[in-house]
């Protein structure tokens, strides 16, 4: 039996590298890893060609343009555009190449600024987002909705999880 081929987009980041370490310990999977220089996730053709040639079975989507408050305030268009492109390119290419399992890493910033604590999943889209990272949050919400839409329309198993700082 061949090993499952798992692509980790963002394997050098904090969450992606933790996922990589856990999967490496299993030993029953083959990890497919590409650096930013090896695969430009903003290039839809490159992402599609990568998926078409690599026979990927599962995807962990941890890649994102991230930054602090100053970066988010200074480059809001870059944050929303680049994150939506990364998510759209990977999710669509995964679907086109019959990858049925995908895990999208969201962010706790998708919850409203004044959400009750502890936050409940039902708080999503129920209030105003924190203005300092709203474009990033909107891109992350778009990724969640992309996963939900591919599941509903195509019967995929694309899931979203929100991490926090606990």
Please describe what each predicted stretch is.
Residues 1-166:
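N-terminal Rossmann-like NAD(P)+-binding domain of SDR-like oxidoreductases, especially those catalyzing
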């Amino acid at each position: 039996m061949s090993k499952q081929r798992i692509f980790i987009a963002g394997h050098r980041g904090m969450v992606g590298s933790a996922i990589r370490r856990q999967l490496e310990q299993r030993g029953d999977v083959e990890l497919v890893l590409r650096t930013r220089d090896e695969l430009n996730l903003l290039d839809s053709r490159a992402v599609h060609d990568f998926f078409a040639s690599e026979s990927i079975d599962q995807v962990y989507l941890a890649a994102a343009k991230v930054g602090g408050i100053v970066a988010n305030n200074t480059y809001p268009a870059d944050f929303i555009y680049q994150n939506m492109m990364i998510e759209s390119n990977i999710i669509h290419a995964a679907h086109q190449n019959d990858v049925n399992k995908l895990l999208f890493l969201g962010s706790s910033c998708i919850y409203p600024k004044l959400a009750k604590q502890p936050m409940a999943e039902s708080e999503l889209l129920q209030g105003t987002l924190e203005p300092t990272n709203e474009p990033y949050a909107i891109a992350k919400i778009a990724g969640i909705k992309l996963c939900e839409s591919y599941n509903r329309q195509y019967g995929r198993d694309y899931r979203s999880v929100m991490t926090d700082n606990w």
